[in-house]
């Protein structure tokens, strides 16, 4: 039958996209071009310029969740966690199903040492990332650190041996390093970390894992402080001219 051959209708665009598409074409084009430049400024670590650019963009159109996600990422960079949380929360209200925004919000709670909220948020992210071999171990590792910080021993014990030394993730060596560090054996902890770096060095995973340890105060930072390296979410605007 003909009906069986028809393509199913596409799900409706989010409300903010529909609203954006109702703007004059010249405004949309200008906004998209300026937003891309703001993303480039962020990637180049020109954080204050990026923040200024976002203020100007907000005057053109204030409903883009990507704007608040990017602004939140800027505030994480300059360690204004309160402002970061405020912007990530605004982004999430505008785009509740965006996983990058959800992760950034969880990360902001983590950086703020609000381990109870961070643990809840990272746990909620596990199902949507279950098929992602890179993200799942990182989420579980952050849950492990939260559990240790909250003195949730049953959960920490459960997560300790989630991965082994042969798995394609630094998880095992980094959890072992934390066990040694928190037990006062710094030399043994350094050995575990060196194993992780020797095996997984040069990968983005080792950077993410050691950053997580630094943010929690388990590892000292060589720069005094570290910042998350997550990229802001794509906005959906880049395909809509």
Enumerate the predicted regions with their spans.
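Alpha-helical segment of the N-proximal tetratricopeptide repeat
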Residues: 24-66, 70-73, 77
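Solenoid-like repeat scaffolds
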Residues: 20-25, 55-62, 89-96, 124-133, ...
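TPR-repeat structural position
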Residues: 47, 81, 115, 153, ...
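Terminal, low-structured helical/coil segments at or just beyond the last alpha-helical repeat
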Residues: 8-18, 22, 188-241
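Canonical tetratricopeptide repeat
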Residues: 69-70, 104, 140-143, 175
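Register position in tetratricopeptide repeats
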Residues: 43-44, 77-78, 111-112, 145, ...
């Amino acid at each position: 039958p003909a009906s069986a051959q028809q393509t199913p209708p596409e799900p409706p665009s989010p409300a903010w996209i529909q609203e954006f598409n109702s703007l004059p074409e010249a405004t949309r084009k200008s906004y998209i071009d300026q937003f891309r430049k703001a993303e480039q400024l962020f990637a180049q670590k020109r954080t204050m310029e990026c923040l200024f650019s976002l203020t100007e963009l907000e005057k053109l159109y204030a409903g883009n969740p990507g704007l608040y996600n990017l602004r939140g990422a800027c505030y994480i960079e300059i360690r204004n966690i309160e402002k970061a949380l405020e912007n990530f929360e605004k982004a999430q209200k505008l785009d509740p199903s965006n996983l990058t925004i959800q992760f950034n919000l969880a990360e902001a709670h983590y950086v703020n040492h609000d381990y109870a909220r961070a643990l809840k948020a990272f746990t909620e992210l596990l199902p949507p990332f279950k098929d992602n071999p890179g993200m799942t171990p990182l989420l579980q590792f952050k849950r492990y650190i939260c559990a240790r910080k909250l003195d949730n021993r049953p959960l920490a014990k459960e997560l300790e041996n989630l991965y082994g030394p042969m798995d394609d993730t630094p998880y095992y060596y980094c959890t072992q390093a934390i066990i040694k560090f928190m037990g006062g054996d710094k030399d043994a902890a350094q050995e575990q970390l060196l194993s992780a770096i020797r095996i997984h060095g040069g990968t983005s995973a080792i950077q993410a894992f050691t950053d997580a340890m630094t943010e929690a105060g388990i590892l000292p930072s060589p720069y005094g402080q570290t910042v998350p390296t997550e990229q802001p979410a794509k906005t959906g605007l880049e395909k809509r001219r």
